[in-house]
Amino acid sequence: PYSDAFANAMKPVYQEYSSDLDLICIYVEALMNRTPWRLWNFWKGIPNPKGSALEAMTILENVFEEFPLAWEHAGLLHMYIHLMEMSPHPEKALKHGDILTDLVPDAGHLVHMATHIDVLCGDYQNVLSRNLLAARVDEAFKLYAGADNFYALYRIHNLHFAMYGAMFLGQKGAALEAVSRLRDEVPDEVVKLYPDIFETFVAAAPHVYIRFGMWDEITNLEQPEDKNLYVTTNALVYYAKAVAYANLGKHKEAENCAEQFANAYALVPESRHLFNNKSRDVLEIANEMMLGEVAFKSGNKTEGLNHLRQAVELDDNLNYEEPWSWPQPTRHALGALLLEVGNYEEAEVVYKADLGIDGKLPRPSQHPKNVWALHGLHECLKRRNDKIELPHVAFLLQQAEARSDIKINASCLCRSKSSYA
């Protein structure tokens, strides 16, 4: 009610001073804060009928068209990026992000902001480089203001985003460095003060290790000492170990870790979140992924694939978040193991959905031009001797592979055999 009241109170002020860029920014932000994180029904690709997204968009697009100085207004640029990121057309804010990146060079959050759009448009190199630049700016601010303040969450956010971009690029070194720096920004003291906010960031490392098939390193991961504090981390480490042991052919150890995961999951409170999603909801995806790979690797391939399909369903129904709470798209594992059993037809559908080629997924759920899904789709198209799509996909794949620092042989390193190199 307070957000509605403020928006209503600002409207006549905006109408009287409709050429004042600062007041326009305040009014637009008030409109957007009526339904934060719910500006759009992104599953349907339409504005939230209970919100004011269309009014905010009309005002902002008009002001950028009518007032050249609007392109130098950090607040207006910032608002437009947030407005469009859940929309069906995030690319409309690309130019706004490009300008904002350099406009306030000493504000790390604003240096980072463009990557909310970059990631949705498949520009993962910008996602990585701009967030690393923002992190450097953050370090300067930390020297000035100290580490224990509200801005700590923004420092973490930038490094989390850098990790996410590196994973999509296939840049193992950058992903490992980002997740290491991320952990350093979340000391035990901070987690103890705000466990429901900060603890889930500590659990990022297992995702990176799985993305790059670091099975031996995963089996050597230690469970957190304080399992009551690090409840999400404890569960995710067991998940990662179950997946790792399954891929190493150690099926008894994998099943044991799967049981330990179930016990750990039971202790995760409903209050624990990763931004807009409950930890328990995110860990449900981990459970299906884990059961899928454990079953598949032990020879129960049909059962395993069904679990992975369920993981995809859960992944698709997470609340919007940037970056997404589940950093390795579930379709990458499903597609890889479908190819392993020779189901090229379903795998092609899986990869096209992930890349956004067929438009079946909501726009914010698509991962355009990512090297992993491009590799899988290229294999599918080559297998059926496609002559139309294959050259285009091959061109995109060559560009994406040129930026990875590892050889990409499959969309997920859980794939144990490949007829394709």
For each of these PLM feature ranges, what is it?
Residues 2, 19-22, 26, 52, ...:
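Structural signature of alpha-solenoid helical repeat junctions
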Residues 14-16, 64-69, 98-106, 136-137, ...:
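Solenoid-like repeat scaffolds
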Residues 26, 79, 113, 120, ...:
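"A position-specific structural signal for the A-helix of alpha-solenoid helical repeats
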Residues 31, 83-84, 118, 166, ...:
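Residue at a conserved register position within TPR or TPR-like alpha-solenoid repeats
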Residues 119, 128-139, 166-184, 255-266, ...:
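TPR/TPR-like (Sel1-like) alpha-helical repeat modules
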